[in-house]
Amino acid sequence: MINLGDKQSTIVVAMSGGVDSSAVAAMLHEQGHNVIGITLQLYDHGMAVGKKNACCAGQDIYDAKMVANKLGIPHYVLDYESKFKESVIDNFVDSYLQGETPLPCVQCNKSVKFRDLIKTARELGAAQLATGHYVRKVNGDNGAELHTGLDPAKDQSYFLFTTTKEQLEYLSFPLGGLTKDETRRLASKFGLEVADKPDSQDICFVPDGNYKSVINKIRPGASESGKIIHVNGFELGEHSGIINYTIGQRRGLGIAYNEPLYVVKIDPKDNIVYVGPESALHVQEFIIKNINWLADEIKDNEKLEVEVKIRSTRPPRLAEISKLDDDKMKVKFLSEEKAVAPGQACVIYAGERVLGGGWITRDIR
């Protein structure tokens, strides 16, 4: 059993209503801590009441309250609909309209969950904010370090790369050394009804999985048809709006050709989707921006060999990074990688440790 310090310290738990955060609340309560549960209502409550496989939906708020009542701990629901729309949903929509492939869960952790929940936890006099993420905080020579969860199948470090050093010092991740099965067994041991609740699968504010309808609702008429052009320069047809295409996409292009074609570039300024053979997807280097760095500072002209992940589901790849300025880095793969998508995160690792990361720009070669 993981122990988070002195008995009777106050710890706020970010309770989503799922099995992970519920198990954390129960675990800390059993250890004798003064646990306070907080759940954020992030989007249209009525739309999501029946949605059970998303995060922070109406059913999940009910489940979080039910768990808190069983444990006998205080529980608060904070209305964050306006903040969530402004910081996450609008960003998600605008990213697609800019020809990018957004990552709303990272934006939510950065702009809403960690920033504001930590502020609230401090106001409540809590010593820590605990979450149900599968990552580890390790005390290094220069302070807290962010490490991958021990269970590679559940590791969530890719989604937490924007966590700052200051935030990391205040956060705790009790499940980082556990597997999902172990967490479910803990929840069963505590008698929690959510022990067998399915994991969230979808983007929480896209309850039916149709992100295009969300975009069209928020920015009606913003996505117009345009040209599909082969990377060799000739026109192949017309696309139905750039929001319908992502880098690496092969199906649903609506064009006929004598070899398989993939989306290799999206130009939002001229409203063009470029396609080409699979070989055109191969990338050697690219630029990332809005860097969050958790390790020792990289010197100017220094080249550092690391591992990077450009999608949460892809394994890390060897690469060389170098600092361009305080907000940009160049990432060069040691061997070519396929389908690097602007708008996605590039997270940088040294073994199990997260060194930092940034957002992939259009500067891809």
From Swiss-Prot:
Query: Which GO cellular component term is one of those annotated?
Result: cytoplasm
Query: Where can this protein be found?
Result: Cytoplasm
Q: Which InterPro entries match?
A: MnmA-like, MnmA-like_C, MnmA-like_central, MnmA-like_central_sf, Rossmann-like_a/b/a_fold
- Native source organism of the sequence: Rickettsia felis (strain ATCC VR-1525 / URRWXCal2)
Write down the top EC class of this protein. Answer: transferase
Active-site residue list? C108 (nucleophile), C204 (cysteine persulfide intermediate)
Q: What is its main location?
A: cytoplasm
Q: Which residues bind ATP per the record?
A: A14, M15, S16, G17, G18, V19, D20, S21, L40, G132
**Protein family:** Belongs to the MnmA/TRMU family.
Which reaction(s) does its UniProt entry say it catalyses? Answer: S-sulfanyl-L-cysteinyl-[protein] + uridine(34) in tRNA + AH2 + ATP = 2-thiouridine(34) in tRNA + L-cysteinyl-[protein] + A + AMP + diphosphate + H(+)
The molecular function GO annotations come to: ATP binding; tRNA binding; tRNA-uridine 2-sulfurtransferase activity
Q: Name one GO biological process term.
A: tRNA wobble position uridine thiolation
Entry EC no(s): 2.8.1.13
Site feature (Interaction with tRNA) residues: H133, Q344
Name assigned to this protein = tRNA-specific 2-thiouridylase MnmA
**Which keywords annotate this record?**
ATP-binding, Cytoplasm, Disulfide bond, Nucleotide-binding, RNA-binding, Transferase, tRNA processing, tRNA-binding
Disulfide-bonded cysteine pairs: these are C108-C204
Against PANTHER family, the record matches this protein to: MITOCHONDRIAL TRNA-SPECIFIC 2-THIOURIDYLASE 1, TRNA 5-METHYLAMINOMETHYL-2-THIOURIDYLATE -METHYLTRANSFERASE
Q: Report which superkingdom the organism of origin falls in.
A: Bacteria
Annotated region (Interaction with tRNA), positions in chain:
154-156
What does the UniProt record say this protein does?
Catalyzes the 2-thiolation of uridine at the wobble position (U34) of tRNA, leading to the formation of s(2)U34.
